[in-house]
Amino acid sequence: MRCVAIFLVVICAFVLQALAEVQCPASGASDQDNLDFCMEYPELIEKCELKSCEGFIKVVS
């Protein structure tokens, strides 16, 4: 029974982490990291002010 409780806590932790708000890449992130972020979260490009994604935006739109 104790194992089941621990298992449920671990599963809940993973779910909560996945639902947490996505953070913008750090200012020191490489262009490749920023581009990966742009492809995964295109709706956050303007919010995060990612300059390295400007070419990507033109290709997508």
Swiss-Prot record:
Tissue specificity annotation: Expressed by the venom gland.
Annotated signal peptide: 1-20
GO cellular component, one term: extracellular region
UniProt keyword annotations, A-Z: Secreted, Signal
Compartment(s): Secreted
Protein name: Small venom protein 1
Originating organism: Pimpla hypochondriaca
